[in-house]
Amino acid sequence: MLFKELVSLYESLRSTSSRLEKTAMIAAFLQQAPVDELPVIVTFLTGRIFPEWDQRKIGIASQSMIKIISTITHNPEDAVVESYKKTGHLGVTAEEMFQKRRQVTFFEPEDITVKEVAETFYEIARSSGAGSSAKKQKILIGLLHRATTPKEAHYIVSLTIEYVLSGAKEGVMEDAIGQAFGATLDQVRRAHMLTSDLGETARIAKTEGAAGLEAITIRPMRPVRPMLAQNVSSIREALDTMGGVAEFEMKYDGARLQIHKVGKDVKLYSRRLEDLTDALPEIVGYVRESVKSDTAILDSECIAIDKDTGRPIPFQNILTRLRRIHKVEETQKQFPLILRPFDVLFNQGQSTIDLPLRERRKILEEIVIATDSVIQPARALVTDQEEKAQELFEESVKSGNEGLMGKDLNATYTPGVRGKKMVKIKSVLDTLDLAIVSAEWGHGRKAGWLTSFEVAALDEETGDYVILGRVASGFSDEQLIEMTEKLKPLITGEHGRIVDVRPEIIVEVKFEEIQKSPIYSSGYALRFPRLVRVRDDLSPEEVNSFTRVMNIYNVQQRYSISENGLRK
């Protein structure tokens, strides 16, 4: 397939805001796509180069892209920067610069194919070591030289930075795959969650139909998105949600880890499907020693502890471990870790996700052999009595944990799904995980830092982010400096002192209450919002929904707050 055909679809998708129209366009396109190119086409349509599970990276930053656009279009870098400030998108800037170039030196090479674009990206990703940055840029310049139109340049650049303005988000793509190949949305979504690969899901749907999708199962060394929990306001609500009886587990203030074991080979993945194996060597050792299964996938919580007291220490210390790929031994001594597996997704060659929790828990306790305190199954209690669950809740909080998880004993494990089969009860007032969508430059002593951050929830109906307020409290100077460096590459536009950013940085925010407000696009505002922590472990898809915001608002209208912070 020619790349210009895909470009034409991108442009058609940009021309409409209707989800139904987008779905129909994509479905028709996928039906005509060659089977061998379908995985790449689907992945490109979502704005990615590689599937979610794939660890490869292009590694070309925005500043390098500005230089590349300047080089290939013979426009000064300052002109490219000014265009970028105006357009807020490097793909659009590339198109604008190529249009100017076309008037002078533009030529017409042969049409490039989707396969050639993909293979060039794969070559860039393979480049590593000394001089790799220059080599990557040279390869990309060669690809851009083959662009036959400014639009093609636009989308090559957009794919390189994985920020395509097509609106073909995962939900739309799942709908389109089902519509194109006669499968239900549930079948497509389940297959997607089990493969972590929409392209592969589409290929199977086209070649094997609904039956092929149903046959897909989880497999070791291919991470899947974790099952997610909803918030509830009390233990009573948790019991009512679970039908009167539930398994309550301690809710640790740690990092979610998905552990894959095949023989002595162990891989550790974050909830964002990032490979953390090299950063956490002691966890690998714990698993090899204590998990008595030849092949297993475990869902777990990794907790940092005080080396003197053995008590849990704040979540941010775990992030120090997760980010560090050098001097691992040094941080290992500074922030020792313990592991609390709480679910099993695969055991001895068989998927366990369709078993009820009560059976999965039994398997977990059989295969995870407690080794002192460093690895043991998460502390759990099965009860129908609110008082007993409350005792465990209080013990959990006194131990330095966040509260409790409540789980339906009959529930299967549903990757990537947030539902009421698993809920969390926390000891503090409500917090929200929100995406930063804009920021403001500071002044005076903080000039050069981004110091105030507009945060937003996700409207699940439209796929858009709706703003809830601006957070400026709770940041140390070090955090502001770090946040500025994180956000700079994500800037998409500037308006005086305000910068718009791609919604990729997630923060946990606490607040006094939610109020109606005409100021923000959501129609609501957080009163006295304050940073709790940066959630590097969360992906943009895990931002709290606007439905969650409205649930909190409605609860706040009906109930008061008890002394321990739980809703009555």
UniProtKB/Swiss-Prot annotation:
Sites where the protein binds ATP: E249, R256, R271, E301, F342, R418, K424
Pfam families attached to this UniProt entry: DNA_ligase_A_C, DNA_ligase_A_M, DNA_ligase_A_N
GO biological process, one term: lagging strand elongation
Family under the similarity heading: Belongs to the ATP-dependent DNA ligase family.
Protein name per the record: DNA ligase
GO molecular function, one term: ATP binding
Reported function: DNA ligase that seals nicks in double-stranded DNA during DNA replication, DNA recombination and DNA repair.
Reactions catalysed, as given in the entry: ATP + (deoxyribonucleotide)n-3'-hydroxyl + 5'-phospho-(deoxyribonucleotide)m = (deoxyribonucleotide)n+m + AMP + diphosphate
Organism: Methanocella arvoryzae (strain DSM 22066 / NBRC 105507 / MRE50)
Cofactors demanded by this protein: Mg(2+)
